[in-house]
Amino acid sequence: MFDLGFWEVLIIMLIGLLILGPERMARAVRMAGLYMGKARAAFNAAKSEVERELQVEEMRKATESVRKDVDKVRKDVEKNARRFEAEADGVGKTFRDVGRQADDAAKGAASGAGGDDARSAGAGDPSGLTDQRGSDQPPAGGGRTAAGERGEPAEAAPAQQSEDTARKGQGGGGEEKRQ
């Protein structure tokens, strides 16, 4: 602390002994030791306080750095969330538009077909299967419909019969009619 070597301390002791004398010298050394101890304690307290302040300042800097990083990430997340919401709204709008168009087309087909010709709208076939042209007529090769309600000749194409069998098996229905 004071950077005093052995020789410096010895010279100070000799001068103190000459000035104070041997009786007062012991008391002066004791008091000097007490003051030196108090000075060291005060110095160490100040040193530790400065170190704590530096640590607090470092923590503040680290906290501020983390806060900036968190703010940056939060802004990125909010930006991506807004973009995602915009895309989701666009997809939802597209699906709503397609649904409206399908509803309009179904209403248009129902009103265009009239109430008497329900079979042309697909209502006559209980299976819901119709030809692509919109009629209940069997395919050009002859054979039965998927429900098998017409009773046409059994000389249907083998592929048609296997399809009928597969459909009946999936529907959980009864046994297939054989003619």
Curated annotation (Swiss-Prot):
Superkingdom, taxonomy of origin: Bacteria
The UniProt record lists the keyword Cell membrane: yes
Pfam families in the record: TatA_B_E (PF02416)
Region annotation Disordered: where it falls in the sequence: 75-179
Protein topology in the membrane: Single-pass membrane protein
Gene3D superfamilies: 1.20.5.3310
Subcellular location field: Cell inner membrane
Residue ranges with Basic and acidic residues bias: 75-86, 94-106
Transmembrane segments: 1-21
An annotated GO BP: protein transport by the Tat complex
Keywords: Cell inner membrane, Cell membrane, Membrane, Protein transport, Translocation, Transmembrane, Transmembrane helix, Transport
InterPro entries assigned to the protein according to its UniProt record, in alphabetical order: TatA/B/E, TatB
GO molecular function: protein transmembrane transporter activity
Gene Ontology terms: cellular component: TAT protein transport complex
Function text: Part of the twin-arginine translocation (Tat) system that transports large folded proteins containing a characteristic twin-arginine motif in their signal peptide across membranes. Together with TatC, TatB is part of a receptor directly interacting with Tat signal peptides. TatB may form an oligomeric binding site that transiently accommodates folded Tat precursor proteins before their translocation.
PANTHER family: SEC-INDEPENDENT PROTEIN TRANSLOCASE PROTEIN TATA, CHLOROPLASTIC
Subunit structure: The Tat system comprises two distinct complexes: a TatABC complex, containing multiple copies of TatA, TatB and TatC subunits, and a separate TatA complex, containing only TatA subunits. Substrates initially bind to the TatABC complex, which probably triggers association of the separate TatA complex to form the active translocon.
Family: Belongs to the TatB family.
Descriptive protein name: Sec-independent protein translocase protein TatB
Organism: Alkalilimnicola ehrlichii (strain ATCC BAA-1101 / DSM 17681 / MLHE-1)
Native organism taxonomy: Bacteria, Pseudomonadati, Pseudomonadota, Gammaproteobacteria, Chromatiales
Name of the coding gene: tatB
